[in-house]
């Protein structure tokens, strides 16, 4: 039993230690297309832009709702604790309990302002879609350059490590020669200094890689504990860009210009909304009411008048009977019956019977209403003038923006050509520096060259490789900037991401 308990305790301890050990971080292999796809799906700014499109759709539906019929109902109940009297005699009128129900129906028939607002809402939807497209273009540009920058830093680090290996080889060779008394201590120290001087650059590059990696994580909305493995190389992306290179100065798809065009249409629709305030509106309406109270109703057949005038059919005079009953009330009618009985010789009874059931009325009304604006000061005129001035301002702004973008696209193409030339020149420099290093290394190994010549050749080779890597990145970054300026949409799996 004790052994079983100890075994169980040991198993639990192992499980506890395993739980306390940090889980290995996940690894994600990223191609450029995969990185762009993740960013376009998960980046918060893209989701905000998509939500704005949904919001504008609800705004449009809200405006359309103004063309639909509206129906409202109301109801009330009141109890007369103290009734209103007609005179000093104390005669009262009205019921103790009153119920009122009602329904109102309104159907718009001609509403110019709503029609203009619906057109404006459609333009607002186009503006939201174009804003989302601009966000996607900007994000694609940022992700591409962040991806290229991380590749640049990692390839630069590889170049520095290769240079470090060459320097270490030189130190080892010089150390052997020094021990064999074939090289001076100065040569050994020079080789060691060359090796040590690479460490600060390597450390700085490693720090830059960490920052670039964090930035790419942020753009892709990925957890920071996910390790990224990038597929592809700068040379491969440059070759693909060269194969598909076609540069045009057409800026008709530029997002800024398209946004200005949409804003111009939006202002024109706004002017129509303002002018629609001058036009009449027509609507149909209907009203239904239901009223009820428990005002006592006098039955003249049981009162003095019925026996007093047996040959008179009081049902022929309902309005008179109802009017007198409502005006005098039960007590007044009883007094009136008694008075008439006394005047007519005591004929009939001096009292009348009453009924306390609810009396209901239900009037129903239909009609058409028209509202014609006649004079509202100068409010509408001033609003129209303000909108026209805004349209003129936007036209001037668009002309300036078009000229500016024309300059930018030409400058971008010039940067592409310059970067391509630098890339070709740097590639030639790498080949020349490699050949010079091989010759110098052979001379130094044969005892004909000096350590200074070897260090200089190695430094030139390292710098040439770094310059070439930087030139390739500059070319790819210029390509990304050019595509953003001309408004080239990114395509996913053969389907255009933004229409």
Report residues per predicted region:
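Residues on the lipid-exposed face of transmembrane beta-strands in outer-membrane beta-barrel proteins
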Residues: 77, 103-109, 216, 368-372, ...
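Bacterial Sec-pathway N-terminal export signals of envelope proteins
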Residues: 19-76, 224, 231-270, 279, ...
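Short flexible linkers and secondary-structure junctions
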Residues: 20-145, 149, 205, 282, ...
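Amphipathic alpha-helical coiled-coil segments
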Residues: 49-63, 135, 139-158, 176, ...
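Sec/SRP-type N-terminal targeting helices
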Residues: 47-51, 64-65, 109-136, 186, ...
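Acidic, low-complexity, intrinsically disordered peripheral segments
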Residues: 6-7, 20-25, 81, 299-304, ...
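Transmembrane beta-strands of outer-membrane beta-barrel pores
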Residues: 77-81, 109, 288-292, 372-374, ...
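Periplasmic alpha-helical coiled-coil/stalk elements that build and connect Gram-negative outer-membrane
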Residues: 138-255, 263-265, 274, 415, ...
